[in-house]
């Protein structure tokens, strides 16, 4: 029995000050009943009360909807970009995007009183009522209050502000597993999430939707697509059955194979009893390379299958066209507008191609994933119940799932035949594209390292490895490679603050600190880290890799900060081989 793998009493993970989640929901519903939902330009133009209402109309009429991600350095720049993208579509004679996901800065996840003092990262913050109002009143493109809106300790603040201006889809539930800058109060965070969800539940009859993006949570590092389905069922169980909100399971960015993507999308729809439209299908982000021209092929391949799946099965979703430059930096408005044009052009070809696809094979794969997902879900509730967790308390369920972590969740609840040759202890029903790619990279890296011979060993080195953000697999490749050359690796995890990294380096006597970063904070993070190291007398060498850029005043897009990092004394090796050479 997999319960034998639980070496602790799960009830010990529940904070002693955690209130009853049902009472939190009731408080949220009471708050929500006193909120008046505003009217957006988009909903006014469509003659509907909510985005969900229009999606349900559109799917029955066969009207394709589209979505885009946007979030430049400031809200003013983002607002101007929205106006330019909208005007560009009109000039080209195409339908503008239907919606945009605001990719806000991580500070938005904090309570309002904590945002100004937290370190700036990439993306806009909404600082006042005017900023919020402009979200829905600048152009008739419907916004989702997406990244960093629900999940953090500032969830309730954000939900109330979003509804008042006419935003009827708010996310991101999966981000409740994140850690926000300088925030370690688990109870306050989960209470804010659950209460915000209660507010959304109060507005379900008005078409308000509680959105998730699976890959931003634990599914992003799951090894099995069946676990994706099971996790979505768990989120829906909490959001719909326990809280009473309407739940949508958006997903897609970490899958390259279009057949698999269609099958997983259909599996998510199959476990969606209320047919809440999947808010968006994120475009493929792992097939892109620094060759922007080649990325056009990735874009079209991904869009065509997502759109055909949506059209054939009347899903009412909105695929996202990923700008071809996004692999290296945040795109500017012209690059976002470019792929909106491509997306609309793809729609002209859907009727010509859709009937040539053998959808039976995709449906068979869908059914296999649904079966595995249901088993994952049932395993989770059974094991939690066996361990005396109150599975009717949304706060308890959420916090236990978070504190178990992705690896333990999949080990305990995952399906497939038991097999210790696989990292999670059982053979996946369908291995994820990202895990497959990562393991292939790992094998190639370890093979390359093996050729270095004894002179490549770092057996006398203690190395702290950490990530500034949620990107788990880059850190996994680093730790695997460093362990293979004999280093004592201190895996300090993801979403770490510089002060905490310094403490660990001091406590372990680390020779080096290796940091992976992808959230536009390289310069600020590096500056604070080096300052705190000097104050603590830590002399470890520091290495940083990933996306080494940051927003700077006067630039529409983040700029490279490698030179600044070098001035701080932080090394930026361009490859793992270069890192190993520098560590020696």
Q: Which residues does each predicted region cover?
A:
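Short beta-strand/loop segments at the ligand-binding rim of alpha/beta enzyme cores
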Residues: 137-148, 205-209, 272-283, 461, ...
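Long, compositionally biased intrinsically disordered regions
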Residues: 1-27, 337-452, 456-457
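Short acidic-hydrophobic, aromatic-tinged amphipathic segments that line or gate anion-handling sites
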Residues: 569-579
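Active-site-adjacent beta->alpha loops and helix N-cap segments on the catalytic face
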Residues: 125-129, 154-155, 179-195, 256-264, ...
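Active-site beta->alpha loop and helix N-cap motifs at the rims of alpha/beta catalytic domains
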Residues: 8-11, 23-225, 551-563
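ATP-dependent carboxylate/acyl-activation modules
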Residues: 434-492, 500
């Amino acid at each position: 029995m997999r319960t034998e793998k639980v070496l602790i009493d799960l009830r010990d993970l529940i904070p002693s000050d955690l209130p009853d989640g049902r009472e939190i929901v009731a408080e949220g519903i009471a708050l929500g009943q006193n909120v008046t939902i505003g009217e957006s330009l988009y909903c006014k133009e469509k003659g509907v009360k909510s985005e969900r209402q229009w999606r349900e109309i559109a799917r029955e009429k066969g009207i394709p909807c589209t979505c885009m991600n946007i979030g430049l350095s400031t809200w003013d720049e983002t607002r101007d970009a929205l106006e330019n993208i909208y005007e560009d579509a009109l000039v080209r004679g195409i339908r503008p995007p239907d919606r945009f996901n605001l990719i806000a800065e991580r500070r938005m996840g904090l309570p309002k009183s904590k945002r100004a003092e937290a370190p700036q990262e990439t993306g806009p913050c909404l600082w006042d009522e005017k900023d919020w109002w402009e979200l829905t009143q600048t152009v008739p493109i419907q916004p989702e209050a997406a990244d960093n809106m629900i999940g953090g300790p500032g969830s309730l603040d954000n939900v109330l502000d979003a509804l008042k201006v006419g935003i009827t889809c708010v996310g991101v539930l999966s981000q409740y597993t994140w850690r926000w800058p300088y925030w370690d109060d688990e109870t306050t965070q989960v209470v804010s999430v659950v209460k915000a969800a209660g507010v959304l539940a109060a507005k379900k009859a008005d078409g308000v939707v509680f959105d998730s993006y699976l890959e931003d949570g634990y599914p992003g590092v799951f090894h099995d697509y069946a676990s994706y389905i099971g996790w979505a069922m768990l989120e829906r169980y909490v959001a719909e059955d326990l809280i009473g909100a309407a739940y949508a399971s958006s997903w897609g960015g970490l899958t390259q194979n279009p057949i698999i993507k269609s099958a997983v999308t259909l599996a998510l729809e199959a476990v969606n009893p209320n047919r809440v439209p999947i808010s968006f299908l994120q475009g493929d982000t792992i097939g892109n390379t620094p060759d922007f021209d080649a990325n056009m092929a990735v874009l079209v391949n991904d869009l065509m299958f997502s759109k055909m799946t949506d059209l054939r099965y009347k899903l009412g979703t909105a695929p996202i066209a990923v700008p071809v430059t996004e692999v290296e930096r945040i795109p500017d408005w012209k690059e976002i507008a470019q792929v909106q044009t491509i997306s609309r052009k793809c729609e002209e070809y859907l009727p010509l191609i859709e009937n040539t696809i053998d959808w039976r094979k995709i449906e068979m794969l869908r059914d296999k994933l649904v079966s595995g997902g249901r088993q994952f879900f049932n395993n989770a509730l059974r094991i939690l119940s066996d361990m005396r967790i109150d599975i009717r308390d949304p706060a308890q369920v959420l916090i236990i799932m978070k504190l178990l972590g992705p690896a333990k969740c999949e080990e305990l609840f995952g399906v497939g035949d038991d097999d210790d040759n696989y990292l999670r202890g059982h053979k996946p029903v369908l291995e994820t594209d990202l895990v497959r790619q990562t393991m292939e990279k790992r094998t190639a890296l370890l093979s390359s390292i093996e050729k270095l011979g004894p002179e490549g060993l770092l057996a006398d080195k203690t190395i702290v490895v950490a990530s500034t953000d949620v990107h788990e697999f880059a850190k996994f490749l680093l730790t695997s490679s460093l362990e293979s050359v004999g280093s004592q690796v201190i895996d300090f995890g993801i979403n770490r603050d510089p002060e905490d990294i310094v403490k660990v380096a001091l406590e372990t006597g680390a020779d080096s600190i290796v940091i992976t970063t992808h959230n536009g904070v390289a310069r600020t993070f590096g500056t604070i880290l080096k300052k705190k190291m000097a104050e603590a007398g830590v002399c470890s060498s520091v290495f940083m890799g990933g996306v080494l850029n940051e927003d700077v005043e006067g630039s529409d897009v983040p700029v490279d900060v490698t030179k600044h990092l070098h001035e701080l004394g932080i090394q930026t090796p361009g490859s793992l081989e270069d890192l190993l050479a520098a560590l020696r």
